[in-house]
């Protein structure tokens, strides 16, 4: 159900509270998922004119789970705070004295419900942390992370239900990784969606038993960051080592991700340097180039009255990854009607060369390769 459809069914006096939750409500570490509501119902009599829904189920993303709490207002007394039912978390009993926004409920503030939900989620986090005391190993993992503010202040924990047969329970740690994405080139962060939310990397680590014999890590990137780093398949994190600890493993993942970000930033600046060098060396031979991301360059060149194009595609992780050179005849066509071309990656190249050296080496390579390309174009293409 879309937020607009849901809000149209809410009692008008309660609508500002719910609107603030579904339109602006982001609680916890997962900034890519908003709060949402379902199961709208009314406690009013059938004679009450609509819209009159005053109770609903609130879905809250937390530590890779979705908490489903019932929130019950009274449309007849909209100035009163709501009641809460915590669904399957029957053992969760929040401390009323710590719910300041509930105790001093201000119906004139449209964000008062959202503020109460945030306080409840904080208490729910404390409740889940307390459950780890049943396992000395999981408690050790939690306490060592807590001692590091960069991890301890950005962590959510969910302890699963205890197995009645074995007495074991699983647990999941969700951490917001302290990785700086601010210097990623802006062109890479475009066109993902209209409201991308916060740029964030979340590491989920699931312990399937209390002795950490089965541990499954997974990295989640917000859409813009995933796109900027080359897609979901571009980053593979290491398996959790047998006998390892989170306090050792999490920095490894941070280091890996930081290096990946630096590769992308370095690639952008190196591509710009590369294209600037080609503009200098080839001058009017440059037909076009990508002036935003510096990922493409096209040259129109001549060798002994034979004109040809060279399309240069620079990869995201340039200069580590070698550019592709595609030679294209301006005279000859393939059977499908396309200009005859050949792609080349087997040419002199070193990622250690600067842009000027790459341009000089490319010019020398063009002179040696063009004769055989011309011969192939005449042999395989049609005028």
UniProtKB/Swiss-Prot annotation:
The modification Phosphoserine is found at residue 2. Keywords: Acetylation, Apoptosis, Cell cycle, Cell division, Chromatin regulator, Cytoplasm, DNA damage, DNA repair, Mitosis, Nucleus, Phosphoprotein, Repeat, Ubl conjugation pathway. GO terms for molecular function: polyubiquitin modification-dependent protein binding. The modification N-acetylmethionine is found at residue 1. One of its GO terms (biological process) is chromatin organization. Residues 275-364 are annotated as: UEV-like 2. PANTHER family: BRISC AND BRCA1-A COMPLEX MEMBER 2. This is BRISC and BRCA1-A complex member 2. It comes from Bos taurus (Bovine). The lineage of its organism: Eukaryota, Metazoa, Chordata, Craniata, Vertebrata. The gene is BABAM2.
